[in-house]
Amino acid sequence: RKIMGKEVKKFGYSCKLDRVVDGDTCDALIDLGFNTFVKKRIRFYGVDTWESRTRDLEEKKKGLAAKAYVKDLLENSDDGKFSIISHGTGKYGRVLGELFVKGHEQSVNELLKENGHAYEYHGEKKKEFGG
């Protein structure tokens, strides 16, 4: 990532979960340091999960399972605390982040894919359900 023409490392932050929105999005209080906090919506970087708010009952079932998986990981991690590596903001203004919880070496993003709750996604046309 470049800032003022110079390559810099990605930024890492400590967070406190507010709520899980769906399988690939949560709201959190982000600690910016110097006793400064901001509440932001975090879109999980590099993954997409099936929709939990849809009329397609099979897709909804998979979407709700992904949401429950994320909720369990984040709520049971150090009283809702987790860390993120920020990848900037997405097209809808959400923070794009890789989430990390205590007790897991892999990111929540990777765990979602590994456990069949998500697929790789970097802004391209979304997959149809079942695809």
Please place each PLM-identified region on the residue numbering.
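Small beta-barrel nucleic-acid-binding modules, primarily SNase/OB-fold domains
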Residues: 1-131
